[in-house]
Curated annotation (Swiss-Prot):
Protein name: Probable potassium transport system protein Kup
Topology of the protein relative to the lipid bilayer: Multi-pass membrane protein
Catalytic activity reported: K(+)(in) + H(+)(in) = K(+)(out) + H(+)(out)
Coiled-coil region: none
Function of the protein: Transport of potassium into the cell. Likely operates as a K(+):H(+) symporter.
Cellular component GO terms, alphabetical: plasma membrane
Taxonomic path: Bacteria, Pseudomonadati, Pseudomonadota, Alphaproteobacteria, Sphingomonadales
Alphabetical list of HAMAP family matching this protein: Kup
Domain of life: Bacteria
A Pfam family annotated for this UniProt entry: K_trans_C
Keyword set includes Aminoacyl-tRNA synthetase: no
InterPro entries linked: K+_transporter, K_trans_C, K_trans_N, Kup
């Protein structure tokens, strides 16, 4: 690892450590009962993994690296699919990683914040920090490929309804995807209630189609559940089995969504819906596809394996099945898009991204957000992927490497949790981690073969976003250090300026990222306007390393004397920030604000790239560009535009 990479990681680590200064709050799912939440989880959490039967089995035997659809390979692949689901989804995520929640929330950034708190700022954590940030970057690549892959795969089913649809598959898929992104600004609260019932019906359809064909070969259930078939596959045809892993992993893509969405439903309901409903439905369908192919003679097998999912359909059910599959892929895509919005908000709050415009699409649900630049950026990339690859089979080559990379990183992060947070002894932790690492490395290695066929796409996307995230975090740290160098201590300023400057009526709020030094905007205001307000509030927004901060810990107000006050507003990394609304509630800590008598003073920095140690010039220029294009503090903190005064300053890093 280069020295520059280490400095970047330390910048990220510092950002997390800075975020880990305020209170803790448990946030868990609430509802009428575990069963209701489990049904809701089916509609949100399992969309990605639920649409895998459309292409996973097919890609093993008819993808870019096809294998012969004989009895050894079919039983071996089915056994690999089942035991992959048991080891990766059930054992790794449901039983282990989902126990490592950050006050009820999951996901790579939540886990990273949890680790930062447990390590208490130790510098040995910088490689783990880098891995966590890279997992976040890989998610964006996955959130571009998933909608393209899933919607294309379902749209291709229209050609089984009527061959006349074949030339229009790509245009229809593009129309659906563009429409999906276009409605994001309106929110999905109204149609979201339909997601659960639709996905329940979809999984029942998967199970029904599977049972229809398993009836011809019931013994396939025993063969699938028998791990000996997977081991025999590797023993008799090891290289082919390794190649097959690259496609088998498509059956578990979306496993990380169980952890990421844990805050909405809870570990118990997600585990219940997985083990009692989703897993059986998926496996029945995979076994049905295998039974159908095995029942055919050698010649027809080649035709069936070209698209086994849609070949399972009875003719009279073709259109309903295709429509239901299409709805399921739209719901899966929606979940990924919403996940990208949520992850972006967390990244902004934790200091990994510049301020971006965040719109709240629901008055009742704080989690319903819309980020325009993320939405349109994803849409452009999804369109390019659909046009560039042209079919779900081609896209499958690009799919998997980002997911397996993220799964490997989750295991790395989990190893830190086991040893430093849970204090597991080596004899207990090492066998668990050994299983996780062996499975993850095998899948990641098998997917590396796909790099020339399209696997490079998510890697390039991930590396690009990783560069942006670490550049912003490092640049922000350098800028804050530069501004803090010449900052005057607040007590000295209060004593020297309070009596000498002319005081005018009203309240002035000066926003500052540091609660120690005098804000630059205050110094500039005094220098140019020669006055101070009767009441001066030095306001700092602090983001905790927990998702939600309770009302009782919203603020701390300190009287500094001479009409000066220090006010700290505390937020969790998943809470929306609304400064005027918060100021109306600070009466709980002894303050009272009249908005019509309050002015907000902000400092807007202009960055000058200089040949100083810290970052290469190209990264300084990249950081300066990100700073210029970030959302203004006035809009991000929802300050009233007619009460805001902006004062500029130049900073060289």
């Amino acid at each position: 690892m280069t020295a520059e990479s280490q400095r970047a990681a330390e910048g990220v680590a510092t950002a997390i450590e800075a975020a880990a200064e305020t209170g803790h709050h448990g946030h868990g799912p609430h509802g009428d009962g575990k069963l209701k939440l489990a049904v809701g989880a089916v509609g949100v959490v399992f969309g990605d993994i639920g649409t895998s039967p459309l292409y996973a089995f097919r890609e093993t035997f008819a993808g870019h690296h096809p294998i012969e659809p004989d009895r050894l390979h079919i039983y071996g692949v089915l056994s690999l699919v089942f035991w992959s689901m048991m080891l990766v989804v059930t054992f790794k995520y449901v039983m282990t990683i989902m126990r490592a929640d950050n006050k009820g929330e999951g996901g790579s950034l939540a886990l990273l914040a949890l680790i930062s708190r447990s390590s208490e700022g130790k510098r040995w954590t910088w490689p783990i920090v880098l891995l966590g940030v890279f997992a976040t970057a890989l998610f964006y690549g996955d959130s571009m490929i998933t909608p393209a892959m899933s919607v294309l795969s379902a749209t291709e089913g229209l050609s089984y309804v009527d061959k006349g649809f074949e030339p229009y598959i790509v245009p229809i898929a593009l129309g659906i995807l563009i429409g999906l992104f276009a409605i994001q600004a309106r929110g999905t609260a109204k149609v979201g209630a339909l997601f659960g019932p639709i996905m329940l019906l979809y999984f029942l359809m998967l199970a029904g189609l599977g049972i229809l064909h398993i009836g011809n070969n019931p013994w396939i259930i025993v063969e699938t559940l028998n791990p000996v078939n997977a081991l025999r596959f590797f023993y008799l045809d090891g290289f082919t089995a390794f190649i097959a892993l690259g496609a088998v992993v498509l059956a578990v893509t979306g496993a990380e969504a169980l952890y990421a969405d844990m805050g909405h439903f809870g570990r118990g309901p997600i585990g219940l819906s997985w083990l009692s409903f989703v897993l059986p439905a998926l496996m029945l369908n995979y076994m049905g596809q295998g039974a159908m192919v095995l029942a055919a003679e050698a010649g027809p097998r080649t035709e069936l394996i070209a698209d086994p999912f849609f070949q399972m359909m009875p003719q009279f059910l073709e259109l309903p099945v295709v429509i239901l599959a299409l709805l399921a892929t739209i719901i899966a895509s929606q979940a990924v898009i919403s996940g990208a919005f949520s992850l972006t908000q967390q990244a902004i709050q934790l200091g990994f991204m510049p301020r971006l415009r965040v719109e709240h699409t629901s008055a009742s649900a704080a989690g319903q957000i819309y980020i325009p630049i993320v939405n349109w950026g994803l849409m452009v990339m999804v369109i390019l992927l659909v046009l560039g690859f042209g079919s779900s089979s081609n896209l499958a080559a690009a799919y998997g490497i980002a997911v397996t990379g993220a799964m490997f990183i989750d295991t790395c992060l989990m190893s830190v949790v086991l040893f430093t947070l849970w204090k597991w002894p080596a004899w207990k932790a090492l066998p668990v981690l050994a299983v996780f690492f062996i499975v993850d490395i095998a899948y990641f290695g098998a997917n590396l073969i796909k790099v020339p066929d399209g696997g490079w796409v998510p890697l390039v996307i991930g590396l690009t976003i990783f560069t942006l995230l670490t550049t912003w975090s490092r640049g922000r740290k350098l800028m804050q250090e530069e501004m803090a160098e010449g900052a005057m201590p607040i007590p000295i300023f209060v004593k020297s300026a309070a009596n000498s400057a002319t005081r005018v009526p009203g309240t002035a709020v000066f926003m500052t990222s540091s609660s120690d030094g005098v804000p630059h905007a205050l110094l500039h205001n005094l220098k140019h306007n020669k006055v101070l307000h009767e009441r001066i509030i030095l306001l700092t927004i602090k983001i905790a390393d927990v998702p939600f901060v309770p009302e009782s810990k919203l603020c701390q107000l300190e009287d500094l004397g001479q009409g000066f006050h220090r006010l700290v507003l505390n937020y969790g990394f998943m809470q929306p920030i609304d400064v005027p609304e918060a100021l109306m509630r600070v009466t709980s800590c002894g303050g009272e604000f009249k908005m019509l008598e309050t002015s907000f003073f902000l400092s807007r920095q202009t960055l000058i790239a200089a040949k100083k140690p810290g970052m290469p010039i190209w990264r300084e220029k990249l950081f300066a560009w990100m700073l210029r294009n970030s959302e203004s503090a006035m809009e991000y903190f929802r300050l009233p535009s007619n009460r805001v005064v902006e004062l500029g300053s130049q900073v060289a890093i």
